[in-house]
């Protein structure tokens, strides 16, 4: 179990590292293309930091509003409240605030910029359709997302995708407006010749494919964090079959979650939107296949 957790952490780390490398590669080429040099990197960093802070501090309020989640007190759902409180103590973090979505489809998610400002959201369907150990498994999974700062990781990943798309757009527009051609001719005049042309070609190819690569990396990070939350959640309850049974039951439920959309689907323990199967489709999925998650839990 501990080896799987460590392995998932390292995979997530290297994916984010590759993400950063892509951002810096695009920024360097944009600087070369426009003669801005290091100024392009400074500009990209400023934009990334501003977008990150905005998303980071407002993410929980935005998600709660989109999901139409309502806060609950201990007197309303004492078992939910006590379960969250007990698992928070076991995880060593402050108790997250509890919210509920008035929907009969079973599902749940966690949000918040850090453990001190976190929420756990469940649907009414989750409370009525899952038994005690299954509910504990789901809450432990969401608690692990909070403890692992997964909201921060996902926020950074989304922002990096935005920065990469922005840089790619700037590069393509700059080249189409003639900046790239002038830069290429300038290099040729200085003896750059073929090297300058190759640089422009490589940069343009990178600008075209980078948004797709960035999106695939973001989704891969999301899938790895789900595996990590499963493993940590099972470690928290000391009963992996509880979470495995919950995943099986939630994925088998056919009721649609009315408030779900593409902007929030990646947050839920099971993607509430229809996903197509197949090797290619899996690359664009926010979650690992449920069968693989259950199999990993059963091996613990």
Give, region by region, the residue ranges found by the protein language model.
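Hydrophobic alpha-helical transmembrane segments of polytopic membrane proteins
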Residues: 203-210
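Polar-ligand-bearing catalytic/cofactor-coordination segments
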Residues: 1-21, 33, 40-42, 47-199, ...
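N-terminal signal sequences
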Residues: 23-28
């Amino acid at each position: 179990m501990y080896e799987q957790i460590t392995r998932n952490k390292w995979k997530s780390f290297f994916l984010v590292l590759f993400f950063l490398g892509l951002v810096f590669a695009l920024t360097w080429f944009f600087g070369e293309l426009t003669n801005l040099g290091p100024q392009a990197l400074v500009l990209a960093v400023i934009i990334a930091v501003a977008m990150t802070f905005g998303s980071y501090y407002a993410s929980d309020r935005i998600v709660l509003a989109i999901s139409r989640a309502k806060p609950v007190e201990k007197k309303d759902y004492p078992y939910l409240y006590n379960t969250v409180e007990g698992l928070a103590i076991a995880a060593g973090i402050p108790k997250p605030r509890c919210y509920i979505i008035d929907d009969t489809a079973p599902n749940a998610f966690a949000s918040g910029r850090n453990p001190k400002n976190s929420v756990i959201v469940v649907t009414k369907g989750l409370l009525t359709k899952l038994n005690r150990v299954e509910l504990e498994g789901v809450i432990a999974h969401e608690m692990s997302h909070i403890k692992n700062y997964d909201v921060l990781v996902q926020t950074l990943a989304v922002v990096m995708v935005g920065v990469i798309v922005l840089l790619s757009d700037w590069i393509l527009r700059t080249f189409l407006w003639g900046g790239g051609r002038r830069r290429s001719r300038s290099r040729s005049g200085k003896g750059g010749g073929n090297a300058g042309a190759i640089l422009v070609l490589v940069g343009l190819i990178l600008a075209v494919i980078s948004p797709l690569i960035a999106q695939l990396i973001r989704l891969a990070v999301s899938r790895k964090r789900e595996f990590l939350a499963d493993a940590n959640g099972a470690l928290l309850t000391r009963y992996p079959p509880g979470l495995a049974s919950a995943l099986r039951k939630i994925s088998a439920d056919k009721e649609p979650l009315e408030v779900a959309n593409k902007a929030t689907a990646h947050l839920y323990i099971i993607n509430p939107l229809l996903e197509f199967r197949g090797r290619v489709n899996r690359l664009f999925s926010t979650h690992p296949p449920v069968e693989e998650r259950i199999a990993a839990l059963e091996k613990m």
